[in-house]
């Protein structure tokens, strides 16, 4: 058997009616793990409801409805295969929590597929000041999604159909915008497609014979293989802590960076509690080592369940152990906030698995969110659409890191009433040593060896 294909995560972005669902549905339909029987059922229902426009979006609508109703659908439905990769669509932006998910990063996307609607009016709506094309592209870049594929969709609906002139015009406009955001347009494939008719999705289309570049499938194969951060020091934010009879205390979480293995002495930030890892398990199987992306449970010695909680971060005690933050400086973008944000604002921050109120202690600068240039020092307030550097103070002990060193622990969302009002990236952290940190006997013994 050959080497298993590499897994990559894709996020599909773009304006409301650009055809994201149809395009994603088409890929999953043609290349994915959807059972043919399920497809037939959907097709029959679509015909009964007279949804002639069914094609592929219907597949996705059904999956979404089932997902939102809490029916656990087989996640294989969101996967498809290319020659080189197993691709998972980690989120499609119709989803309510799309922006939060992108930031708190249940999984970090390796590539963004930006879908553009080139029809007259459609394109202008997407790229206008309020259009989501801009916001999504900016978010993707700010959150470290380095690679992008741009699909000029609905080529079957341009005037005239499959218009090269319209495609050229779109490429020019979108390139200049993406350049302002921070992407290098020369490294982006601009693929003219029809998610509905299937042109250039998987096979070359004779309707687009003027286009000589890759199909969408080829472009996905040309993504650079992502480097997984297993060589960095360990960071494992806890999602839960269980007490399991006969075993003891078992913290659970996802390895974000580094590796964890039995026998390692770990320090939990922010409390500084240090102990030895007895065993590491994933899907009820013991592991000799867990890598980034693995969701694991691990058993720790001489530790009570009360000593650990969600939001704590496990780290290697001998390799840059995690500590609490006294304060940190972030670049924040205000998104859906109705009022003004000034010094003293204290919302709840979602950063990795922690959910803690943080005070905006000082607004340091206001910056141009497109270019990053400073516009004003010590602004009185920030409002919708503004970006700025802010010094923040956690109201309770919490672990954060700079985005540059540990990306998953360096980005956050500010949410009020289930609405994301701001997103941020952490630029600097002032750490503090814990007071009275407990070192278990097992850890002390290990350290003395």
From Swiss-Prot:
Subcellular location(s) of the protein: Cytoplasm
Region (G4): 153-156
UniProt keyword GTP-binding present: yes
Record keywords: Cytoplasm, Elongation factor, GTP-binding, Methylation, Nucleotide-binding, Phosphoprotein, Protein biosynthesis
Gene Ontology terms: cellular component: cytoplasm
Molecular function per GO: GTP binding; GTPase activity; translation elongation factor activity
Domain tr-type G: 5-230
Modified residues (N6-methyllysine): 261
Summary of the function given for this chain in its UniProt record: This protein promotes the GTP-dependent binding of aminoacyl-tRNA to the A-site of ribosomes during protein biosynthesis.
Family: Belongs to the TRAFAC class translation factor GTPase superfamily. Classic translation factor GTPase family. EF-Tu/EF-1A subfamily.
Name of the protein: Elongation factor 1-alpha
